Amino acid sequence: MNGTEGPNFYVPFSNKTGVVRSPFEYPQYYLAEPWQFSMLAAYMFLLIVLGFPINFLTLYVTVQHKKLRTPLNYILLNLAVADLFMVFGGFTTTLYTSLHGYFVFGPTGCNLEGFFATLGGEIALWSLVVLAIERYVVVCKPMSNFRFGENHAIMGVAFTWVMALACAAPPLVGWSRYIPEGMQCSCGIDYYTLKPEVNNESFVIYMFVVHFTIPMIVIFFCYGQLVFTVKEAAAQQQESATTQKAEKEVTRMVIIMVIAFLICWVPYASVAFYIFTHQGSNFGPIFMTLPAFFAKSSSIYNPVIYIMMNKQFRNCMLTTLCCGKNPLGDDEASTTGSKTETSQVAPA
């Protein structure tokens, strides 16, 4: 084995020289230089400084402006809540541990940090699944006279939390476990060992199949059908130009969110899968640290995409920030905002 396994950790460093110490008790400077730990801390500080204000602002602006409280926006707000979970439950912890060079909060703190990070990532993933299904139903019209209303949005939000908890909670109750990963300053699912005592192998397989592969299949199916339908409708001019433009704008925004999610999380998932399927292989701490910390940047991109691509929300945000006046003088809802207030499908 090219790593060192302890009762509640796995350090990707051979202990032939006897230098490996518990990541809960001693600095891990034999894994990387102190300045590299400082760089991780600086990166986490940047994510906190950017992630908290922009996600909090998303929630606050929506509460302040009634016209933003639409069914589709419930799902988008759910993403902001998930991102705040990651900021408070994960980023602040990792910032502190990186400054110390090891996970100073012990196994209990590791469980909490790993839980919040996993929960936030999974809520984001399943929110994108719900958005993909909503876009598919609204644009592709597989059901006639269907109206995506408030109750559907609430059920969609509840579904994302149930599925996220089904992934994040089991390691807390004995099915798999959370351990420090990479440079041992943040925690995640144990992809490094089989650990039969906690049935780790079965959980990792379950996680990759149910909480990554299936959501990706659903998302790609929905958007594959959606692209085909939009092209067909444009060719046949089945919808008004205003309706087509509005639906295209919303669809484009959601697709960009999916692409951004894939860019952030696929490297992490790929490295984790490689480590799990190549038990005992030789890899350094940076190998897992870089994709893990890159994935954490997902807490920033969703609200940025939403603000940049939703004119109605952008106007409301500027009005809120400028004490009730929009400096751009454009305070009317865009076609996207008015169209998505209640998504409706008429008979094809």
UniProtKB/Swiss-Prot annotation:
Write down the position(s) of the site called Plays an important role in the conformation switch to the active conformation.
113
Q: Indicate where the modification N6-(retinylidene)lysine is found in the sequence.
A: 296
Question: What ranges does the Extracellular topological domain annotation cover?
Answer: 1-36, 97-110, 174-202, 275-286
Q: Tell me where in this chain the PTM N-acetylmethionine is found.
A: 1
Q: Where in the cell is it found?
A: Membrane; Cell projection, Cilium, Photoreceptor outer segment
Q: Name one GO biological process term.
A: phototransduction
Q: Which Pfam families match?
A: 7tm_1 (PF00001), Rhodopsin_N (PF10413)
Q: List all membrane-crossing ranges.
A: 37-61, 74-96, 111-133, 153-173, 203-224, 253-274, 287-308
Going by the entry's taxonomy, the superkingdom of the source organism is recorded as Eukaryota
Lipid modification (S-palmitoyl cysteine) maps to 322-323
The intrachain disulfides are: 110-187
Q: Does the keyword Transcription apply?
A: no
Cytoplasmic compartment ranges equal 62-73, 134-152, 225-252, 309-348
Q: What InterPro entries does the database record attribute to this sequence? A: GPCR_opsins, GPCR_Rhodpsn, GPCR_Rhodpsn_7TM, Opsin, Retinal_BS, Rhodopsin, Rhodopsin_N
Locate the region Interaction with SAG.
330-348
Q: Which UniProt keywords apply?
A: Acetylation, Cell projection, Chromophore, Disulfide bond, G-protein coupled receptor, Glycoprotein, Lipoprotein, Membrane, Metal-binding, Palmitate, Phosphoprotein, Photoreceptor protein, Receptor, Retinal protein, Sensory transduction, Transducer, Transmembrane, Transmembrane helix, Vision, Zinc
One molecular function GO term is: metal ion binding
Carrying Phosphoserine, the residues are 334, 338, 343
Instruction: Spell out the subunit comment.
Output: Homodimer. May form a complex composed of RHO, GRK1 and RCVRN in a Ca(2+)-dependent manner; RCVRN prevents the interaction between GRK1 and RHO. Interacts with GRK1. Interacts (phosphorylated form) with SAG. Interacts with GNAT1. Interacts with GNAT3. SAG and G-proteins compete for a common binding site. Interacts with PRCD; the interaction promotes PRCD stability. Forms a complex with ASAP1 and ARF4. Forms a complex with ASAP1, RAB11A, Rabin8/RAB3IP, ARF4 and RAB11FIP3; the complex regulates Golgi-to-cilia rhodopsin/RHO transport in photoreceptors.
What family does the database annotate? Belongs to the G-protein coupled receptor 1 family. Opsin subfamily.
Q: What does this protein do?
A: Photoreceptor required for image-forming vision at low light intensity. Required for photoreceptor cell viability after birth. Light-induced isomerization of 11-cis to all-trans retinal triggers a conformational change that activates signaling via G-proteins. Subsequent receptor phosphorylation mediates displacement of the bound G-protein alpha subunit by the arrestin SAG and terminates signaling.
Name assigned to this protein: Rhodopsin
Q: Which organism is it from?
A: Felis catus (Cat)
- Give the taxonomic lineage as stored in the record: Eukaryota, Metazoa, Chordata, Craniata, Vertebrata
